[in-house]
């Protein structure tokens, strides 16, 4: 965000008088922020230093994530750039087949059977 330009600003409106909401249909599940790999550990340290309850470092195979909730309960994610989706398939054919991270491979049949076609 520091470089400016399109999609480079985040504006936060603080309105403490609003009621806390309950998650439901049509609501926001989570908001993800991308960070360079070199900054990932600093974000983890900063959350911990500030006393923000968080998931700790989570390996998502294609990237690493940190999760924490803002005061109204929306889940925020800070995700690293790498290693990236091309770690296990050629970039030219990304998205042409169903690729699962190794820790989910044993559940492939169940996952694939629950997928709904996109019209």
Predicted regions and their residues:
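Glyoxalase I/VOC metalloenzyme domain signal
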Residues: 1-54, 69-119
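Conserved S-adenosyl-L-methionine
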Residues: 55-59
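Short acidic/glycine-enriched loop/turn segments that link adjacent beta-strands
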Residues: 60-64
């Amino acid at each position: 965000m520091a470089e400016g330009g399109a999609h480079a600003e985040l504006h936060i409106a603080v309105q403490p008088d609003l009621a806390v909401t309950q998650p439901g249909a049509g609501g926001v599940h989570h908001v993800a922020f991308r960070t360079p790999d070199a900054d990932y550990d600093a974000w983890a340290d900063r959350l911990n230093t500030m006393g923000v309850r968080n998931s700790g470092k989570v390996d998502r195979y294609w990237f690493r994530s940190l999760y924490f909730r803002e005061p109204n309960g929306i889940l925020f994610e800070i995700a690293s750039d790498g290693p990236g989706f091309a770690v296990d398939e050629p970039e030219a054919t990304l998205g042409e087949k169903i690729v699962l991270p190794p820790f989910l491979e044993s559940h492939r049949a169940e996952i694939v059977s629950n997928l709904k076609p996109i019209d």
